[in-house]
Amino acid sequence: MVDYYEVLGVQRHASPEDIKKAYRKLALKWHPDKNPENKEEAERKFKQVAEAYEVLSDAKKRDIYDKYGKEGLNGGGGGGSHFDSPFEFGFTFRNPDDVFREFFGGRDPFSFDFFEDPFEDFFGNRRGPRGSRSRGTGSFFSAFSGFPSFGSGFSSFDTGFTSFGSLGHGGLTSFSSTSFGGSGMGNFKSISTSTKMVNGRKITTKRIVENGQERVEVEEDGQLKSLTINGVADDDALAEERMRRGQNALPAQPAGLRPPKPPRPASLLRHAPHCLSEEEGEQDRPRAPGPWDPLASAAGLKEGGKRKKQKQREESKKKKSTKGNH
């Protein structure tokens, strides 16, 4: 007999949040539209996962299941007369697709995360704490007929929207999105870009989601201002992306933190040794005097001679005065 706890891969004391996380993961993994090469097994697994979630996510159904197993939900329970079951005539499981749609709020789980932010204000929705989302009135896809339905496979689509100001949302000037991927979730990728004018500045937000990792880049008038990965700012990735784009206008760094100048390439040392030796030689040896000027030399010698004669006269006077005293 199928054990619903084993189907979802959770412990018997799992919390409601654990059960939701398990269903989300397995429903996305086994959705028939994502497993066209193994559709029969995927449909079976998808149905089991939906049944397990439908029972374990409801406190009353879970309590009966824990006590009497699946038979208790069917109105049996090993004789059925020794307990009162609220499902006396048997519990009917819903269509797994209905469970799936209800869980994801009627929107395509393979793409709604990627469109959510640009359209939230437009539809009047507000995003709560990270990981929780307020559900809007109706399906996201019902607003625009160009989106694929749940049965279309979500394997590839490319769509764009412009001039949302005409729809009553003056701040959002443009939005475009591209999503693609094949069978399975391993190679699914989505890129969405939205542009807003805020106080005369063009703010562009680019979101890239690939293999479960979300990367968000925010530009202001063409200059990259912030970069987050899975909601966390990454300064190293920001610096690397700025470098790649040639946007090196980073904040001034203290002198001690500036990178040292790179050494001269070895190729230059090999190909121009005479140039380097001449430069280094000029730095090491003393500077030679300028051209010889005969007039300046004569003036110097004459001045030196006068000083020497004056010194001799002073010494002679001192000697005479010394003899007179004796």
UniProtKB/Swiss-Prot annotation:
Entry GO CC: cytoplasm; cytosol; membrane; nucleoplasm; nucleus; perinuclear region of cytoplasm; Z disc
Region listing for Interaction with HSP70, in residue ranges: 2-146
Molecular function, one GO term: ATPase activator activity
Outcome reported for the amino acid change (mutating F89I): In LGMDD1; the mutation results in inefficient inhibition of protein aggregation by isoform B
Domain J: 2-69
Tissue specificity as recorded in UniProt: Widely expressed. Highest levels in testis and brain, and lower levels in heart, spleen, intestine, ovary, placenta, lung, kidney, pancreas, thymus, prostate, skeletal muscle, liver and leukocytes. In testis, expressed in germ cells in the earlier stages of differentiation pathway as well as in spermatids. In brain, expressed at a higher level in hippocampus and thalamus and a lower level in amygdala, substantia nigra, corpus callosum and caudate nucleus.
GO process annotations (BP): actin cytoskeleton organization; chaperone-mediated protein folding; chorio-allantoic fusion; chorion development; extracellular matrix organization; intermediate filament organization; negative regulation of DNA-templated transcription; negative regulation of inclusion body assembly
Highest rank taxon of the organism: Eukaryota
Modified residues (Phosphoserine): S277
Consequence of changing F93L: In LGMDD1; the mutation results in inefficient inhibition of protein aggregation by isoform B
Main localization, broad class: cytoplasm
Location of this chain's protein in the cell: Cytoplasm, Perinuclear region; Nucleus; Cytoplasm, Myofibril, Sarcomere, Z line
Function (record text): Has a stimulatory effect on the ATPase activity of HSP70 in a dose-dependent and time-dependent manner and hence acts as a co-chaperone of HSP70. Plays an indispensable role in the organization of KRT8/KRT18 filaments. Acts as an endogenous molecular chaperone for neuronal proteins including huntingtin. Suppresses aggregation and toxicity of polyglutamine-containing, aggregation-prone proteins. Also reduces cellular toxicity and caspase-3 activity.
PANTHER family the UniProt entry points to: DNAJ HOMOLOG SUBFAMILY B MEMBER 2, SIMILAR TO DNAJ HOMOLOG SUBFAMILY B MEMBER 6 (HEAT SHOCK PROTEIN J2) (HSJ-2) (MRJ) (MDJ4)
Quaternary assembly: Homooligomer. Interacts with BAG3, HSPB8 and STUB1. Interacts with ALKBH1. Interacts with HSP70, KRT18 and PTTG.
Related illness: Muscular dystrophy, limb-girdle, autosomal dominant 1: An autosomal dominant myopathy characterized by adult onset of proximal muscle weakness, beginning in the hip girdle region and later progressing to the shoulder girdle region.
Name of the protein this chain belongs to: DnaJ homolog subfamily B member 6
